[in-house]
């Protein structure tokens, strides 16, 4: 089977535009000569972009592709201007990838919400749904739910009793939310589970006794939760995901975890109960954290790290058990030297 590569396949993505290059430059804060009047119709990678498309370079390893591109305009840093082919307009910015995100969103904005409640949706009469919200097929909205303006609830999603969400939230298909408070612009992708019981039980002579989980989940503004991730509600304190944080697919957050602002949690990370993260913490794929830890702001934890102790702010740690990155790589280098003897 042969499928031609297409950026923004119109079967799936609605394109806006065209836009004059001056409008694109203004959107990213770039300056261009006053006589530039090129009309741009879309975005594409350097290798396949055509004369009416915008591309970008943020990684120098692709500099050769920049020199050969046929794009109409490219978003680059100042130190790459001399490698832009003749006839290609350079949009010079300090952060090309950030500018690229804004330009791509300009050409491919999010689909507008289609206000209304699908006839097959099950909506409790006590739910409060803003008239501008969209409730999809077979969605379930339970008693006392509050859904703000411009929200979209996709097919088969279940919004449990009392859940409250702000404006412009997106809840993916087959997601379930209970015992949760959502801010504005929260994106919950398909299959996510939010607000279920935390993993709490007390041992007894006859087995285990389940501990009631009496907290909530709070997702602050601009949080995104990737597909099939799970966030347990708190036992007595809330589980909190700080504003602007991004959780990848298949992430597990246990009860009472408190995450600061703008954290990045990559796929298959597991954070045990009552662990606290500061702001701008990064956890790479499959990292595991035991409970009741404190991870300082700006800490970076490597892939598959096993974190069993507090991590100071700004630290970089890797390995299992986790240790400072410099120590880890020094040990690896020593082992390699010993192995050659």
From Swiss-Prot:
Q: What are the catalytic residues?
A: 255 (proton acceptor)
Coiled coil (UniProt feature): none
Q: In which pathway does it act?
A: Bacterial outer membrane biogenesis; LPS lipid A biosynthesis
Cellular component terms, GO, for this chain's entry? Answer: membrane
Q: Which GO terms describe its molecular function?
A: N-acyltransferase activity
Q: Which reaction does it catalyse?
A: a UDP-3-O-[(3R)-3-hydroxyacyl]-alpha-D-glucosamine + a (3R)-hydroxyacyl-[ACP] = a UDP-2-N,3-O-bis[(3R)-3-hydroxyacyl]-alpha-D-glucosamine + holo-[ACP] + H(+)
Pfam families cross-referenced by the UniProt entry: Hexapep, LpxD
One GO process term, biological-process aspect: lipid A biosynthetic process
Q: Which InterPro entries match?
A: Hexapep, Hexapep_transf_CS, LpxD, Trimer_LpxA-like_sf, UDP_GlcNAc_AcTrfase_non-rep
Q: Does the keyword rRNA-binding apply?
A: no
Q: Which keywords describe this protein according to UniProt? A: Acyltransferase, Lipid A biosynthesis, Lipid biosynthesis, Lipid metabolism, Repeat, Transferase
Which residues are connected by disulfide bridges in this protein?
Answer: none
Cited NCBIfam families: lipid_A_lpxD, PRK00892.1
For this chain, the family text in UniProt reads: Belongs to the transferase hexapeptide repeat family. LpxD subfamily.
Task: State the PANTHER family in the record.
Answer: UDP-3-O-ACYLGLUCOSAMINE N-ACYLTRANSFERASE (PTHR43378), UDP-3-O-ACYLGLUCOSAMINE N-ACYLTRANSFERASE 1, MITOCHONDRIAL-RELATED (PTHR43378:SF2)
* Role played: Catalyzes the N-acylation of UDP-3-O-acylglucosamine using 3-hydroxyacyl-ACP as the acyl donor. Is involved in the biosynthesis of lipid A, a phosphorylated glycolipid that anchors the lipopolysaccharide to the outer membrane of the cell.
The record's subunit annotation is: Homotrimer.
Q: What is this protein called?
A: UDP-3-O-acylglucosamine N-acyltransferase
């Amino acid at each position: 089977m042969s499928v031609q590569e297409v950026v923004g396949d119109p079967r799936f993505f609605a394109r806006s535009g065209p836009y004059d290059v001056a409008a694109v430059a203004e959107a990213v804060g770039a300056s261009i000569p006053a006589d530039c009047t090129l009309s741009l119709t879309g975005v594409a990678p350097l290798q396949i972009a055509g004369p009416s498309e915008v591309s970008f370079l943020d990684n120098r390893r692709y500099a050769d592709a920049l020199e050969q591109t046929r794009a109409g305009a490219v978003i680059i840093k100042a130190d790459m201007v001399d490698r832009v082919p003749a006839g290609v307009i350079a949009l010079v910015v300090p952060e090309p990838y950030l500018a690229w995100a804004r330009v791509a969103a300009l050409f491919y904005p999010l689909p507008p919400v289609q206000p209304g409640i699908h006839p097959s949706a099950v909506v409790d009469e006590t739910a409060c749904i803003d008239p501008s919200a969209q409730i999809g097929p077979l969605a379930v909205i339970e008693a006392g739910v509050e859904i703000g303006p411009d929200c979209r609830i996709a097919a088969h999603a279940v919004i449990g009793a009392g859940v409250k969400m702000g404006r412009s939230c997106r809840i993916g298909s087959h997601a379930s939310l209970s015992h949760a408070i959502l801010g504005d612009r929260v994106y919950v992708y398909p299959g996510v589970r939010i607000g279920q019981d935390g993993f709490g039980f007390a041992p007894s002579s006859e087995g285990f006794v389940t501990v009631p989980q009496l907290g909530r989940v709070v997702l602050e503004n601009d949080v995104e939760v990737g597909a099939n991730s799970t966030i347990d509600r708190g036992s007595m304190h809330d589980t909190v995901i700080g504003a602007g944080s991004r959780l990848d697919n298949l992430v597990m957050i246990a009860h009472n975890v408190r995450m600061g602002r703008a954290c990045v949690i990559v796929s298959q990370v597991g954070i045990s109960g009552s662990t606290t993260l500061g702001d701008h913490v990064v956890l790479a794929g499959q990292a595991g954290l035991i409970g009741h830890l404190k991870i300082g702001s700006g800490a970076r934890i490597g892939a598959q790290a096993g974190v069993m102790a507090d991590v100071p702010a700004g630290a970089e740690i890797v390995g299992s058990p986790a240790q400072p990155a410099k120590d880890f790589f020094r040990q690896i280098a020593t082992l390699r030297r010993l192995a050659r003897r």
